[in-house]
Amino acid sequence: MLTCNDCSTWEQFVNYIKTRCSKTAFENWIAPIQVLEESREKIRLEIPNIFVQSYLLDNYKKDLCSFVPLDAEGNPALEFVVSEIKRSSPQIAASVTKPAVEVSEENKDFQLKLNGAYRFDNFIEGPSNQFVKSAALGIAARPGRSYNPLFIHGGVGLGKTHLLHAVGHYVREHHKNLRIHCITTEAFINDLVHHLRVKSIDKMKNFYRSLDLLLVDDIQFLQNRQNFEEEFCNTFETLIHLSKQIVVTSDKPPGQLKLSERIIARMEWGLVAHVGVPDLETRVAILQHKAEQKGLNIPNEIAFYIADHVYGNVRQLEGAINKLTAYCLLFNKPLTETTVRDTLKELFRTPSKQKVSVESILKSVATVFQVKIQDLKGTSRAKNVPLARQVAMYLAKTLITDSLVAIGAAFGKTHSTVLYACKTIEQKIEKDALLKNQISLCKNNIAIDSPQHFV
């Protein structure tokens, strides 16, 4: 055991581990942990999410026993407290260009077609994607042992594919013996059609079922393709049964996909995580990061000006930077607000005269809370539904001008039920940071359907 008279036992443990793990692992899993209270009997730690707790105990339990107090059973006497989501300015990890991973001859069939730019260390984190990034890191660190499958859903251009490929890179670098395959749903279907045509379907089945990690992008393209859906579901179930990790992305949560109940149930087995529309601070961080990659120096006030007008998704922000960079270089123009306005006027969103509707609110709330729209308008008391229904009523009262009676009618409720729901949510958001963040995500999503600026 290391000793240090000026260090607490936790600090001694951290200093010890820092020299024995990679910089990335330390920054992702150890550095975020904060000591709340330390005594001879136990240590109380604040962690950003439950994945950090699992990673710490799974990988460093023996080391912990050498430094921290132990309980009666000889286990580390640690108490974990999950911190509230903080809306601080997003941090940008330094982007490091890494060499392509070499694949041995025997694993050539499993060579990954991963985008080298999509890694965890250059994924811009903010309140809208903090949870899903932690989930992706958690399963990448412990494939097949955490949440399986991991189902990532969200709108176009919000980072789903980035996270999918980041999982692939991380697993390849930290679990070198695992067989990994990353594929789009369309490519899976084409692969299946090919093997059916040449009568080698068993070869395809053997390939997919020998994988340790399967990464599938855009599962929504499996809709209305019943025969292909059945084969995918069979492969899916086999891998899950063998504790092989699966990660799936989609533009909708499982319950909103037009797939069989069987496959929807399988998708919901593990963890369903939503990637939301980035808030203003996150959009600014993304813009500055993209501009830095292009060699464009973008002042804070210009970044905020662009982010305030381009707020649909990350691809639009990247397109804005590409257009600005080209314009400034070709015409030798300085980067001013006038230059930005003239160059990006086609991208800039203007407040719409279209009113927010109850339907757009229901769609957004259903996506964030992972429930069905019909349940929000019905009497279901299933998990998440009552709270989501109250949030939808609260947003309807807040964002549209209809009377309480009209809002109640849209939900099949009385005006007094709407009033009760609004008061309940107003009280809860004062104490519940997670709920407050979920409501913010709902508003961001509504803004995409009915572009307006919400305070």
From Swiss-Prot:
It is found in: Cytoplasm. Belongs to the DnaA family. Residues 1-95 are annotated as: Domain I, interacts with DnaA modulators. It holds the Pfam family Hda_lid. HAMAP family: DnaA_bact (MF_00377). One of its GO terms (biological process) is regulation of DNA replication. InterPro entries: AAA+_ATPase (IPR003593), Chromosome_initiator_DnaA (IPR001957), Chromosome_initiator_DnaA-like (IPR020591), Chromosome_initiator_DnaA_CS (IPR018312), DnaA_C (IPR013159), DnaA_dom (IPR013317), DnaA_N_dom (IPR024633), DnaA_N_sf (IPR038454). Oligomerizes as a right-handed, spiral filament on DNA at oriC. One of its GO terms (molecular function) is lipid binding. PANTHER family: CHROMOSOMAL REPLICATION INITIATOR PROTEIN DNAA. It comes from Chlamydia muridarum (strain MoPn / Nigg). PROSITE patterns: DNAA. Its main location: cytoplasm. Domain I is involved in oligomerization and binding regulators, domain II is flexibile and of varying length in different bacteria, domain III forms the AAA+ region, while domain IV binds dsDNA. Keywords: ATP-binding, Cytoplasm, DNA replication, DNA-binding, Lipid-binding, Nucleotide-binding. Residues 113-328 are annotated as: Domain III, AAA+ region. Residues 329-455 are annotated as: Domain IV, binds dsDNA. GO terms for cellular component: cytoplasm; plasma membrane. Residues 96-112 are annotated as: Domain II. ATP binds at residues 157, 159-161. Plays an essential role in the initiation and regulation of chromosomal replication. ATP-DnaA binds to the origin of replication (oriC) to initiate formation of the DNA replication initiation complex once per cell cycle. Binds the DnaA box (a 9 base pair repeat at the origin) and separates the double-stranded (ds)DNA. Forms a right-handed helical filament on oriC DNA; dsDNA binds to the exterior of the filament while single-stranded (ss)DNA is stabiized in the filament's interior. The gene is dnaA2. This is Chromosomal replication initiator protein DnaA 2. The keyword Transferase does not apply. It comes from the Bacteria.
